[in-house]
Curated annotation (Swiss-Prot):
It comes from Agrobacterium fabrum (strain C58 / ATCC 33970). Belongs to the FliP/MopC/SpaP family. One of its GO terms (cellular component) is plasma membrane. The lineage of its organism: Bacteria, Pseudomonadati, Pseudomonadota, Alphaproteobacteria, Hyphomicrobiales. This is Flagellar biosynthetic protein FliP. Plays a role in the flagellum-specific transport system. It is found in: Cell membrane; Bacterial flagellum basal body. It comes from the Bacteria.
Length: 245
């Protein structure tokens, strides 16, 4: 996890550091020249990027698919707050670490380590660190979603490819759209058996004339029992992890 955090921190910090100049000694003089103003702007931009680091992490990893699947599971079982949001987010985060570990390791080996050893400069490090994430997103993005954003960008006159490589402005939203879609596809398969249990219980209670008794309160124990008997967590997590390319 420490390697992951260092990799993300370097990836976020390098774009600002790559163009940063040395801190000027006359920063507090009454007359501020252009270099000082540029340094202030770059520092402000770097702090802004670091403040949105969690959002950047969500955009380029497997986190959305896990969160959507776990949330739909909880809703399908009829549990309002069990497991809690903290537990679901923690599970999604550590499952993301597991799925993304080859990507993090490659980014660390190819980009961070050579930079720390002064073998490459900051610009080369940014490219090497970002390349494993590009490979992961390319492998898990639907062609239809990618084509959608490519067509929209071309309609606006934007350059979407450089040296046969798709621009991140196109790849990242296409990847997020694909992740959300797959999350809902898996969620549908999760919620379907619970819906069947609800329908069976509702039919039985209506046949018995128990109109005032909510069917969901009766079906909840059966849904929990069903999920435990089929080892649902094992099946769900295994299916989610194997669904990534």
């Amino acid at each position: 996890m420490i390697r992951f955090l260092v990799t993300i921190a370097v990836l976020l910090a390098l774009p600002g550091l790559a163009n940063a100049q040395q801190f000027p000694s006359d920063l507090f003089n009454t007359q501020i020249d252009g270099s000082v103003a540029a340094w202030i702007i770059r520092t402000f931009g770097l702090l802004t990027v670091l403040s949105v680091a969690p959002g950047i992490l969500i955009m380029v990893t497997s986190f959305p698919r896990f969160v959507i699947a776990f949330s739909i599971l909880r809703s399908g079982m009829g549990l309002a707050s069990t497991p809690s949001n903290m537990i679901l987010l923690s599970m999604a985060m550590f499952m993301t670490f597991y799925v993304m570990s080859p990507t993090f390791d490659k980014a660390w080996t190819d980009g961070v380590q050579p930079l720390l050893q002064n073998q490459i400069n900051e610009q080369q490090a940014v490219q090497r660190i970002a390349e494993p994430f590009r490979t992961f997103m390319n492998a898990n993005t639907r062609d239809k979603d990618l084509k959608l954003f490519v067509d929209i960008a071309r309609e606006r006159g934007q350059v979407v490819m450089t040296d046969n490589v798709v621009d991140y402005r196109v790849l990242v939203p296409a990847f997020m759209l694909s992740e959300i879609r797959r999350g809902f596809e898996i969620g549908f398969l999760i919620i379907l058996p619970f819906l069947v249990i609800d329908l069976i219980v509702a039919t039985i209670t209506m046949a018995m004339g128990m109109m005032m008794l909510p069917p969901t309160s009766i079906s909840l124990p059966f849904k929990i029992l069903f999920f435990v008997l089929i080892d649902g967590w094992n099946l769900l997590v295994g299916s989610l992890v194997r669904s990534f390319n």
